Amino acid sequence: MAEFKGTREAFAHAIINMAKTDDRIMFVSPDSLKAMRATTFAELYPEQYVETGIAEQAAVDVAAGLASCGLVPFVGTYAGFLTMRACEQMRTFVAYPNLNVKFVGINAGLLGGEREGVTHQFYEDVGILSNIPNFTILTPADGPQTYHAVKAAAEISGPVYVRAGSGREVEVYDKETPFTMDGIRILKEYGDDTLLLSSGFVLDRVLRAADLLKEEGIHVTVGDVNIINAEDPSKVLEAMGKVKRIVTVEDHNIHGGLGAYISKLAVENDPKPIKRIGLTTFGESGPAAELADYYGFSGEAIAKAVKENL
């Protein structure tokens, strides 16, 4: 596998590799070619690249048309520009007819807006799409998982949203680990005091919290939840059933994302105490690591929240 760094480059490498053997793969760019690190794709496969300019709604409509002809289009740009500006088109012209369009939203989460701040920090995207039927929502944790998530998206029938970041993500997975369609991967099993669930680009911090807690005699299990509102949540429910309580951590608003998904599963299947860690307000500009610490995503802050929930 070629070398890449971060979720954006991972996306570009994935569609290039797929296009080598599948001429149905298309990239529709609403003036996002450079942002998606996909310039090489356009050079290698000019007939599989469509540029709409700064027109997200038009890009989604074009992709819907391509999908209706049997092609597999990917629309990639900033997460908020997709899910907010083009929400109606994603709903009515893709999800309603259940067309095979794939969306990749970059700069998702608080940590994506290091330079731009609130206008380029998108922590509502999963919540928005969670309300639209037929969407599969994939939330890979880092670059390697994004690469495999994009390839997995191409194999899923119907609309798929892949949540990607800014390129500053800390790599947790090696490049060979596939994207599991079970909806969860257990990474540490120290004990059943708490199930510590992560979604997206805070996984490295969640793993640190687990190690800090272990040093204090608190033994948790860590799970990476990589599909939100999975059609078959049986593996997630299995993990939930083995512990006394749950803490969720997500680089997203606590409404509509991982915390809401797990709370719904618990209420309907196995009620138990749940603590949700995520955003409850708008973000701000600043270095990604400092923002993560300030908004409660440090390993120490997560460990403290777990202890308070015991």
Which role does the model predict for each range below?
Residues 1-163, 168-169, 178, 299-301, ...:
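Thiamine diphosphate
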